């Protein structure tokens, strides 16, 4: 089972919060103290809370659940995409479009347009267009791929959100709350933990910390999915490799 130790977290700087003047008092239970006007997060809370989150995400994956990774700020963007791809899940790593979950019907139409344009770009349709029209469609394809590429094969709403930076992604969290989709999120000392079902108190800016969270979640999801395949193999539903 995927787990992360206190040593791993210390090495990655998970315990460094934000400057004390930017704190959210709701995070007080998770703060150990302050050093040089920077809040220090109590890892004695974070370690078990993160490992509980990993276990739950693994369970969701073992039931064929779809997990949407969300991290649109620059520090997290590439790692979010890589980790989601690494465990065959889904991601939003650029701008969160308002209504991405709550207005899924419209989003589905945009995904259909994206897939149509992908086919056109590959089957020679673009070559038959005027230069201007081909350029316009290429730009439209790039724009749609950037915003929806990570969810184009999701085929419906996700079963859980894993979020890097609850403060930055508050719109995504609100939408998930409205739909009853469980939210797992890294919550720093400047963020509001309300609306997060599985709080992971920790640094949400350091690349090493972000990579630690994402790597562990991807491992937990892969393990969960392999459990599902093992069960199916036992029941004769799939051939064991």
Curated annotation (Swiss-Prot):
One annotated Gene Ontology cellular component of this protein: cytosolic small ribosomal subunit
GO BP, sorted A to Z: translation
Keyword entries, A-Z: Ribonucleoprotein, Ribosomal protein
Top-level taxon: Bacteria
Pfam families in the cross-refs: Ribosomal_S2 (PF00318)
Residue ranges that the Swiss-Prot or TrEMBL entry lists as coiled coil: none
Single GO molecular function: structural constituent of ribosome
Similarity comment: family membership: Belongs to the universal ribosomal protein uS2 family.
NCBIfam families: rpsB_bact
Protein name: Small ribosomal subunit protein uS2
Name of the encoding gene: rpsB
